[in-house]
Structures are given as structure tokens and as C-alpha cells.
């Protein structure tokens, strides 16, 4: 894969953009790739949603998500969230998604029933954190949006830093840099950083 990811916060926009980068631009084929789990939307870096190959989502997220997770941690106190609440959100998400993908409203309903009050930005924050920690990812199209799925069941096994790069960060950074320069060049190291 020459590219690593493309920004994808606007789902219809990123589907169209991805389709335009294929030999036969067809948004239906992009949706089919999402449904098959070959491409995925995730939060690998900068607190932004990206569309990327499923085989790259976990290792890139493990490599790049620490700054956005630190920034998110600073936003928790005003939301009334702490690590205990996030642990409960993760536990309930793992249980709720164990039988397969579910919609965001369904997951937020599970959190509401668990006393986690997902309104007022709390649900988004909990979901962002679980995606940036490679616990949950966007999964198949449900007709109006993407359902949410467990990374462990939706993304390829062995696609983490340990599986792809023997846990070594330097070869992973080199791969990411090579792909960045191939898709964005000419560019500098500062551009990459």
C-alpha cells in the first residue's frame, strides 16, 4: 500500500475521495471494502478520523496515538471522566460488541444503562479513547452509518506493532515515513513530524 491513510471525519466525503482514487470510481465498492473489513476508519493520530487499510490501523495507532491520548486525558476532568469510568466504558463495550458490531446509539445506550451518562460529549470522548487505544474501531456500514466493532475481531490478527515489526518502533517509523514521502512528496522530515 503506497498510502497509509486519508482524513475521514466526513463519512460521505471520504467514501467519495477513496472511490476517486481507484481505477473505477465507485462509492459502492468503497462501502463493500468497509463491510469486508479491508479498510477501516480509526483515530490513529492527531485526534482525527482517518480511513486506512485494516492491516495498518493497529500498528499506526500504537505508533502515533500517544499525543492525542495525552491531550484527551486533559479534557476528562471537565467531562467528569476518569480512568475508572474509562475502564467501565471499555468493559461494557467489550461485552456489548462481543457478539458482533453494533451501532453507536446502541453502544451509547449500553453506557447509559451502565451509569456512564454518554451525553454532553462524554460518549464521544469514551468512544474516541477506546478507538485510539485500539480496542474499538468503526466496522460495517449499517445503511446510515458505520457500526462499531472490536478491533480484536474486526481487524487482522498480527497487525499490531509486535506482529508487523517485532515490536520495534524504528522500522515502523521508517515504513510510515516511506509511505508518507511516496504519497506526499516532495516533503521534508519536518512535514512528516
Predicted regions and their residues:
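Loop-centered beta-sheet repeat module
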Residues: 120-193
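Phosphate-backbone binding and catalysis cores of DNA-processing enzymes
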Residues: 1-119
Amino acid at each position: 500500500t503506497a498510502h497509509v491513510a486519508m482524513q475521514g471525519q466526513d463519512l460521505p466525503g471520504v467514501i467519495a475521495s477513496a472511490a476517486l482514487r481507484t481505477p473505477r470510481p465507485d462509492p459502492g465498492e468503497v462501502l463493500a471494502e468497509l463491510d469486508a473489513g479491508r479498510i477501516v476508519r480509526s483515530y490513529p493520530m492527531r485526534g482525527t478520523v482517518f480511513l486506512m487499510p485494516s492491516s495498518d490501523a493497529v500498528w499506526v495507532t500504537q505508533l502515533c496515538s500517544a499525543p492525542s491520548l495525552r491531550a484527551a486525558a486533559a479534557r476528562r476532568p471537565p467531562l467528569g471522566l476518569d480512568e475508572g469510568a474509562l475502564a467501565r466504558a471499555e468493559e461494557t463495550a467489550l461485552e456489548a460488541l462481543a457478539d458482533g458490531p453494533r451501532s453507536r446509539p446502541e453502544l451509547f445506550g449500553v453506557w447509559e444503562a451502565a451509569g456512564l451518562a454518554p451525553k454532553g460529549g462524554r460518549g464521544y470522548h469514551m468512544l474516541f479513547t477506546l478507538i485510539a487505544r485500539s480496542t474499538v474501531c468503526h466496522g460495517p456500514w449499517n445503511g446510515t452509518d458505520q457500526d462499531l466493532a472490536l478491533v480484536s475481531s474486526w481487524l487482522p490478527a498480527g497487525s499490531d506493532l509486535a506482529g508487523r515489526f517485532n515490536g520495534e518502533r524504528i522500522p515502523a517509523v521508517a515504513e510510515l515515513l516511506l509511505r508518507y514521502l511516496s504519497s506526499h512528496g516532495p516533503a521534508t522530515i519536518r512535514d512528516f513530524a
